């Protein structure tokens, strides 16, 4: 497993690689041949980065293909386009990439701060219009190495996520393989379930589970039923996406639940106090293991896009892995 990070300037590029298996570091500066040798010696390894799914892998592939990394950099950073759109030739360079960046995205410096690490960034301006000096190269290498080391820390903090993905791959070797490790969990699960894109246009044909015990908050369910009837009368399901999106955003129920102001809508529920709450004594934060997946199986709510019944096996595989991880701690 190799952790890596690229830095790109107009006239220079560099990268730091840390092979945690061999316990070796590689610093490559403006040397495509050296990069090619490293890649070819480790082409079947897992390359781990922070945002490498959207950035670093395309810089690396571009250099290996003889492209200008600055052009790729500006395509992604300045023009805000997807790296894969730059060239179909990227497909000629197979890489097993695993991205540590969470979804929704959070900057590496933010997580470094949470970990109590130094979050100072390099003083070298990425917009420099000339060759870097020796001192600027050294400073950039220093901060690039720091980011790779921090990426390793973040990976270890989130290793359960990697193990879960790897566990699914091991459980379904005929459907997915190690090259899929870089996909999101949702995408890997979709492959395992054999999901295909389908259009139902019946999002308001929902029902309320009989297990609901809302008591004094029954009016929240009534509000959703009222909105359901309203949407059906408008035939909203068959309207264009813009009309749907506008209607969804306009719907909201503001109420107080357990003394906390809450906002209900079709995107979910959010609750928070206007000011922080300070309490002393015993505080319990209770979570239910696999609550949502368990509910899907219990009430037959697994996605209709699935073409097989692998979901319970995915569920049991992940549950068994979590139990092993907890026992090992």
What are these regions (language model features)?
Residues 10-11, 41-44, 90-94, 145-148, ...:
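Short, well-ordered loop/turn elements at secondary-structure boundaries
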Residues 114-122, 128-299:
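Conserved "right-hand" nucleotidyltransferase catalytic core of DNA-directed polymerases
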Residues 1-8, 97-99, 284-286:
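Two-metal-ion RNase H-like nuclease active-site motif
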Residues 1-82, 242-277:
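Conserved RNase H-like, two-metal-ion catalytic cores of nucleic-acid enzymes
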Residues 47, 52, 57, 66-149, ...:
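Active-site-proximal helix-loop-helix substrate-binding element of RNase H-like nuclease domains
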Residues 279-280, 286-329:
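Conserved catalytic core of nucleic-acid polymerases
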């Amino acid at each position: 497993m190799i952790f890596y990070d690229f830095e790109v300037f107009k006239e220079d590029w560099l990268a730091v690689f840390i092979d945690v298996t061999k316990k070796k570091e590689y610093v490559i500066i403006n040397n495509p041949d050296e990069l090619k040798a490293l890649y070819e010696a480790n082409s079947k390894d897992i390359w781990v980065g922070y945002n490498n799914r959207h950035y670093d892998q395309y810089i690396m592939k571009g250099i290996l293909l003889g492209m200008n990394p600055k052009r790729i950099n500006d395509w992604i950073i300045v023009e805000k386009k997807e790296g894969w759109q730059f060239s179909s030739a990227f497909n000629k360079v197979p890489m097993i990439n695993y991205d540590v960046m969470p979804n929704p995205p959070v900057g590496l410096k933010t997580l470094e701060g949470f970990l109590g690490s130094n979050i100072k960034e390099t003083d070298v301006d990425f917009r420099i219009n000339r060759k870097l000096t020796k001192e600027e190269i050294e400073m950039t290498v220093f901060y690039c190495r720091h980011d790779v080391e921090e990426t390793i820390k973040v990976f270890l903090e989130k290793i359960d996520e990697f193990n879960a993905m790897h566990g699914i791959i091991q459980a379904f070797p005929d459907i997915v393989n190690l090259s899929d490790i870089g996909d999101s969990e949702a995408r890997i699960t979709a492959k395992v379930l054999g999901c295909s894109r389908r259009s139902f246009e019946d999002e308001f044909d929902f029902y309320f589970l009989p297990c609901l015990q809302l008591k004094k908050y029954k009016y929240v369910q009534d509000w959703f039923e009222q909105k359901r009837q309203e949407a059906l009368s408008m035939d909203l399901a068959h309207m264009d996406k813009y009309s749907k999106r506008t209607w969804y955003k306009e719907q909201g129920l503001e109420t107080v639940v357990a003394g906390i102001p809450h906002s209900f809508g079709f995107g979910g529920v959010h609750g928070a106090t206007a000011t922080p709450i300070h309490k002393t004594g015993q505080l319990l934060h209770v979570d239910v293991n696999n609550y949502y997946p368990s509910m899907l199986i219990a009430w037959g709510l697994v996605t209709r896009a699935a073409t097989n019944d692998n979901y319970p096996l995915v569920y049991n595989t992940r549950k068994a892995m979590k139990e092993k991880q907890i026992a090992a701690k």
